[in-house]
C-alpha cells in the first residue's frame, strides 16, 4: 500500500509482537507456534518484501524491529523465557541481516524496550516499575518512537540493538 501511494520505501518498522507470561515447562506447542509466528515469521516476511523493494529502488533503506530488553537481560524469575527466545531471535536476525545487506546500504537495527508505560503494565504501580531501572523512571512510548526515528535516519548504523530501558540492560546496579 505504501509503495502504491508513495512510489518507494525508505524505512520499515516491524512492531508486531506478542508476549506470553508462563513458566518454561507450561508453554505448549501452540503457545510456541503463536510466539514464533508473530514475533519471528511476521518480521521475516515483511522484511523480505521491504528488502526486495529497496533492492529494486537501488537506494538502500532502513529496517527496524522492536525486540525486548529482557531477551538480553532477563529479570531473575521472570516467567517469559520462550517469548524472550523469539525476541532474541530477532536480535540475532538484525546482526546477520545487516551483514548480508550492508553492501546494498540496507540497514537492519532493533530497538529493545524495557518496561514501558503502556496498557500491558497498567495494573502495576508506576513507582514499582520505576524501581526496575537505574534511572528511576519508566520508558514511554515516545522514547521508543524517538529511538526508531533515530535508527531510520542514522545512515552509518547497522546491526545494532538499541536498548531503551533506562539503563536496566547494564546489569546489576
Please state what every model-predicted region is:
Residues 8, 85, 91-94, 100-116, ...:
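Conserved Rossmann-fold SDR core element
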Residues 8-10, 54-69, 78, 103-106, ...:
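Active-site loop of short-chain dehydrogenase/reductase
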Residues 15-20, 167:
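Conserved NAD(P)H cofactor-binding loop of Rossmann-fold oxidoreductase domains
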Residues 23-24, 31-36, 121, 129:
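Substrate-binding pocket helix/loop in short-chain dehydrogenase/reductase
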Residues 47-48, 95:
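A short, exposed helix-loop element centered on a Lys and neighboring polar residues
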Residues 64-89, 94-103:
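Catalytic loop of short-chain dehydrogenase/reductase
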Residues 106, 140-164, 169:
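C-terminal substrate-recognition "lid" of short-chain dehydrogenase/reductases
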Amino acid at each position: 500500500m505504501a509503495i502504491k501511494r508513495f512510489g518507494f520505501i525508505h524505512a520499515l518498522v516491524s512492531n508486531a509482537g506478542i508476549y506470553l507470561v508462563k513458566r518454561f515447562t507450561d508453554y505448549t506447542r501452540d503457545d510456541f507456534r503463536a510466539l514464533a509466528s508473530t514475533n519471528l515469521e511476521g518480521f521475516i516476511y515483511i522484511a523480505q518484501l521491504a528488502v526486495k523493494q529497496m533492492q529494486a529502488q537501488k537506494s538502500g533503506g532502513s529496517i527496524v524491529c522492536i525486540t525486548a530488553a529482557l531477551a538480553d537481560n532477563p529479570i531473575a524469575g521472570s516467567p517469559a523465557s520462550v517469548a524472550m527466545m523469539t525476541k532474541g531471535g530477532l536480535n540475532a536476525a538484525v546482526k546477520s541481516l545487516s551483514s548480508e545487506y550492508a553492501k546494498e546500504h540496507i540497514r537492519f537495527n532493533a530497538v529493545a524496550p524495557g518496561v514501558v508505560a503502556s496498557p500491558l503494565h497498567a495494573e502495576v504501580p508506576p513507582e514499582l516499575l520505576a524501581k526496575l531501572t537505574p534511572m528511576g523512571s519508566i520508558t514511554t512510548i515516545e522514547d521508543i518512537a524517538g529511538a526508531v526515528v533515530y535508527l531510520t535516519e542514522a545512515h552509518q548504523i547497522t546491526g545494532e540493538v538499541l536498548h531503551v530501558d533506562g539503563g536496566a540492560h547494564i546489569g546489576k546496579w
